[in-house]
Amino acid sequence: MSHAFDKPVLHDVTISSTGELVVLVGASGSGKTTCARIAAGLIEADTGHATIDARLVCPGDVGMCFQRPQDQLFAQSVAEDIAFGPNNKGFSPDDVEALVAYAAARVGLDQQVMGASPLTLSGGQARRAALAGTLACATYAVVFDEATSGLDGEARSQVLHLARELANEGKAVLAITHDVSEWLPFADRVVFLEKGRVVADVNVQEAQTNPEIYEAAQLDCPLFVSVLHELLEACYV
């Protein structure tokens, strides 16, 4: 797919991720967020399109977890926020209630938090509420857009493990990040984007051991990647 605003942002980007956790990494301005929004059905590509199992993606098919939980929390109560997506899909009241209960239980939201205003939540509670809203919408796929940025260790771990679990359950999972290190233990593949183009689409092992990929994507190479590369080179000398 390709997309342009005042100038081209994406050029012939293809990412397949059914049942996988694919990490899309790139520097600021590389086109990551545009790719995420197309994948979630929020905007249309100028050429090409987003599909899941050959089916065109609609906004209601994909749950999207944004960097800022506040961008997903705007109703009078957390329960209403979680129900927003299923209600918009036209689900029956019973189905909406079941989805809200499932999503809340999965991220550990109790009844007190469910009845609270989003404005009163702590940072960790807000992230869990946003995750629950994402889960309630995630019919086929989930997009995490810088969803671990600024989180403490516990909240970050919850996001990462949830993403892995969703992929294991057969959903397509796309994680957008500028820092690939924390996602590598959970990922199946890593796609490196630079100036709107895919410069590498590799398995996790290669992303952990090949510094040249990071150079091609104009990214700082994580120290552990350089160390592993040197160790492997030494083993083959």
Protein language model features and the residues they cover:
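ABC ATPase C-loop
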Residues: 134-135
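Catalytic Walker B motif of ABC-type/P-loop ATPase nucleotide-binding domains
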Residues: 142-145
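Helix-to-loop junction immediately C-terminal to a conserved catalytic motif
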Residues: 40
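Helix N-cap at the start of a conserved alpha-helix in ABC-type nucleotide-binding domains
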Residues: 153-155
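Conserved ABC ATPase "signature" region
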Residues: 95-112
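Conserved ABC ATPase signature
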Residues: 117-121, 125
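H-loop/switch region of ABC-family ATPase nucleotide-binding domains
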Residues: 177-178
